[in-house]
Design a protein with these regions (language model features):
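An acidic, phosphate/nucleotide-engaging active-site surface
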Residues: 1-40
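A generic local secondary-structure boundary/capping motif
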Residues: 14-23, 35-36, 48, 82-86, ...
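Structural motif
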Residues: 27-29, 138-142, 173, 271-272
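Short helix/loop capping segments that flank catalytic or ligand/cofactor-binding pockets
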Residues: 29, 35-38, 56-59, 104, ...
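Mobile "lid/hinge" segments at catalytic clefts and subdomain interfaces of large enzymes
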Residues: 32-33, 41-95
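Membrane-embedded hairpin module used as a gating/binding unit in multi-pass transport
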Residues: 69-146
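Short, glycine-rich nucleotide/cofactor-binding loops
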Residues: 144-154
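C-terminal non-catalytic interaction/assembly regions of soluble proteins
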Residues: 155-156, 160-285
Length: 285
């Protein structure tokens, strides 16, 4: 059963499992990595969503449609809502770590659940963040290869990181095997049932559904730029996801270059992200 602590300003019910609510001391453990709408993981997430109800998670995650809810933003409205909920419950101490690509601990921060988490975030930025001072016309991005790109649901993480540096009207060349297709039933259903990407976003605004939330995250990107997908997915499935299928990266790149030249009358500015699931462009302009 759960204990009710109140409601956040954003309307998230703070309902926490009784064993945690009744504890004399609460200590949170976790790792800090980029999160595509909470900004970063770690910190307050040990309590919310870690020890909360499905309804609370849905309410908090519905804030993901805010323009400020993106990877690399320590003040994401999703993050701030989590921390407000955590203050209502109380989290006495945390230990948050940063991992390298081989899952080895390279940094640890401990103490207050906000201050220690922010400390770990800054260290994560030093390792995996990349400062950029202008947008690109074309971004070529890969999740980093198997087993991180088995389906489109997984590939969404790299796609979301690539959205930051691409200009409005630009092109993202997304590369991944996607041999398992869409990879998640609700994600696939929402894509197939929509006529336009905007319909997917509107659907999530009306009713938040896990799985559908990733479809909406992809659709938001598709509303502002083109996505060329180089994968093993059948062309019809790629088009059902509102993307353009290509057999090779070279073919996709040639098409993206031609599009830029046609629309802007100049050679494109390009960015390549071979480990797009791990690296986040930090836009500084």
């Amino acid at each position: 059963s759960f204990r009710h602590f109140g409601t956040t300003k954003a309307g998230t019910p703070v309902d926490i499992i009784e064993e945690v609510a009744d504890a004399d001391v609460r200590v949170g453990l976790g790792n800090v990595e980029y999160h595509y709408f909470a900004g970063y993981s770690g910190g307050a997430k040990a309590i919310m969503p870690g020890c909360s109800t499905f309804e609370a998670i849905q309410a908090n995650h519905s804030l993901m449609l805010s323009p400020e809810a993106h990877a690399g933003n320590m003040e994401s409205p999703v993050r701030l809502d989590l921390e407000e909920a955590c203050r209502m419950v109380g989290l006495d101490f945390i230990v948050n770590v940063v991992l390298d690509e081989d899952r080895h601990i390279v940094y640890a921060a401990a103490g207050d659940f906000v201050a220690a988490q922010r400390d770990a975030c800054h260290h994560l930025d030093d390792l995996y963040g990349c400062e950029l001072h202008e947008e690109a016309d074309i971004v070529v991005v890969s999740q980093g290869g198997a087993p991180k790109d088995l389906n489109l649901y997984q590939l969404q993480k790299a796609l979301d990181n690539a959205k930051h540096p691409v200009r409005d009207g630009g092109t993202i060349v997304l590369v991944g095997s996607c041999q398992e297709g869409f990879g998640q039933p609700t994600f696939e259903q929402w894509m197939r049932e929509a006529v336009t990407p905007h319909e997917v976003v509107k659907r999530l605004k009306k009713t938040f559904v896990l799985g559908g939330h990733k479809a909406a995250a992809v659709a938001q990107i598709e509303e502002r730029c083109d996505i060329y997908l180089v994968s093993d997915m059948p062309d019809a499935e790629v088009r059902a996801a509102f993307m353009t299928p290509f057999a090779t990266v070279q073919e996709a790149l040639d098409a993206a270059r031609a599009k830029t030249l046609r629309e802007l009358g100049r050679a494109p500015r390009m960015l390549v992200m071979p480990h797009g699931g791990s690296n986040v462009p930090l836009m500084r302009f």
